[in-house]
């Protein structure tokens, strides 16, 4: 059965001899497409399946994985590839999305993120953190932000990755550095907000690469996986 889909290309890799696997995000799923002869010199599909491509694909459903037959590019966000920091951030997002159960909001949010990175807009890190918020929530590993994760005291002073939520002064025992009030409010707002409240969070709080890295490491730690893309992003953090 042949099906037409719209998809965002997350990654492409070689498979067997000259064939390829393309990981894509659609409106309702995360798919791995099989592409015959993708890495042959005369391949017409290689340019089509570059990361940061928003495409329309014709696929054929197969037993193991869908086969990509043909397609066309709706928009290629090529400027992202020219920015080491933004592209590295996006590759972290793509890796985490690829390991996540589908969240219905991810498609449009990732498009907003790509658009912001491509046009060098100020809200890129906000959208990146929203992508991570949805990934974390879909995995059921979101931090406890209604009070101290151990005693529910609402007078909290830090967010602990290992403990899984806010800590009050007593439960922290000076283990972790205190966060300023604005930072605590920001993370509570991030994980309490619904889709209709995103604009409020965007206007009232500033997000940066440190937030992106922290949320990425949160998902990495609590999902018990290792992502080299996060290590690379950390290694170039000081160059920004």
What are these regions (language model features)?
Residues 1-20, 25-240:
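Non-catalytic alpha-helical scaffolds and adjoining flexible linkers that form interface surfaces
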């Amino acid at each position: 059965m042949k099906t037409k889909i719209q998809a965002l290309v997350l990654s492409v890799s070689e498979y067997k001899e000259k064939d390829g696997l393309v990981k894509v995000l659609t409106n309702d799923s995360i798919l791995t497409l099989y592409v015959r002869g993708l890495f042959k010199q005369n391949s017409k599909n290689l340019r089509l399946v570059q990361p940061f491509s928003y495409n329309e694909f014709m696929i054929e459903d197969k037993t193991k994985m869908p086969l990509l037959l043909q397609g066309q590019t709706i928009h290629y966000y090529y400027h992202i590839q020219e920015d080491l920091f933004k592209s590295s951030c996006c590759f972290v997002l793509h890796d985490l999305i690829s390991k996540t159960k589908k969240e219905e909001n991810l498609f449009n949010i990732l498009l907003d993120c790509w658009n912001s990175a491509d046009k060098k807009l100020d809200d890129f890190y906000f959208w990146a953190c929203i992508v991570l918020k949805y990934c974390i929530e879909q995995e059921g590993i979101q931090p406890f932000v209604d009070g101290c994760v151990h005693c529910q005291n609402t007078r909290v002073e830090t967010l602990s990755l290992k403990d899984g939520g806010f800590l009050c002064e007593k439960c922290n025992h000076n283990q972790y550095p205190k966060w300023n009030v604005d930072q605590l409010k920001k993370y509570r707002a991030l994980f309490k907000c619904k889709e209709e409240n995103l604009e409020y969070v965007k206007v009232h709080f500033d997000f940066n690469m440190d937030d992106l890295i922290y949320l990425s490491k949160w998902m990495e730690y609590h999902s018990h996986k290792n992502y080299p893309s996060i290590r690379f992003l950390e290694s170039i953090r000081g160059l920004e």
